[in-house]
A protein has these predicted regions:
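Metal-coordinating catalytic core of metallo-dependent amide/deamination hydrolases
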Residues: 36-155
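A conserved active-site cap/scaffold subdomain adjacent to cofactor or substrate pockets
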Residues: 157-160, 166-167
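Catalytic-core regions built around general acid/base machinery
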Residues: 105, 164-165
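Short acidic active-site motifs
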Residues: 34, 160-161
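Alpha-helical scaffold segments that flank or form the walls of functional sites
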Residues: 1-43, 66-78
């Protein structure tokens, strides 16, 4: 997507949020600086994640790391209403190594982690096939469950996994 595509999409999203009474949001998308600029323009508060997709490729993981290291330094260019976080997309697009790095990065910079998890039955089945574990149990095994982790969706999570997340 172009910078202009993201700009107008973010502008529309902010306008809809304002119309509905939303004052603060947490977003993970391409071109996070553009979303941050729009957030400033529109007067909202936002936590904006630098999205990561490594596709289980080490070179892509390194690009993601560098991108997020630069992004987190940009926070001082914005008012206190705009904060950055890290957004490893999902367990089916991001390697375990990058998830562990994102966890360490978030702890070091005291920022949240935005992660899509347990969105579909297919994701749970694929996780069981690939890792031998459900998505939440896979994250537990990696050691990346923490209060910094914000899960988007979380539809297919059982009661034991809810307790794991709460702990």
């Amino acid at each position: 997507m172009t910078r202009e595509d993201v700009y107008w999409g973010a502008k529309l999203a902010c306008l809809e949020m304002i119309k509905s009474g939303t004052t603060t949001f947490f977003d993970m998308y391409q071109r996070p600086r553009v979303t941050a600029d729009v957030t400033e323009e529109m007067g909202l508060r936002g936590i904006i994640a630098g999205v990561c997709f490594d596709g289980f490729d080490k070179e892509e993981a390194e690009k993601c790391k560098r991108h997020n290291e630069r992004l987190i330094q940009d926070v001082d260019n914005y008012s206190k209403r705009v904060r950055f976080s890290i957004g490893p997309h999902a367990i089916y697009t991001v390697s375990g190594e990058l998830l562990k790095w994102a966890h360490r990065f978030a702890m070091e910079h005291q920022i949240p982690i935005h992660l899509h998890l347990a969105e579909t039955e297919g994701e749970v089945k694929d996780s069981l096939d690939r890792f031998g574990l459900t998505p939440v149990r896979y994250l537990y095994k990696l050691g990346v469950l923490s209060p910094r982790l914000i899960i988007a969706h979380g539809i297919y999570i059982d009661d034991d996994e809810l307790r794991m997340l709460a702990d």
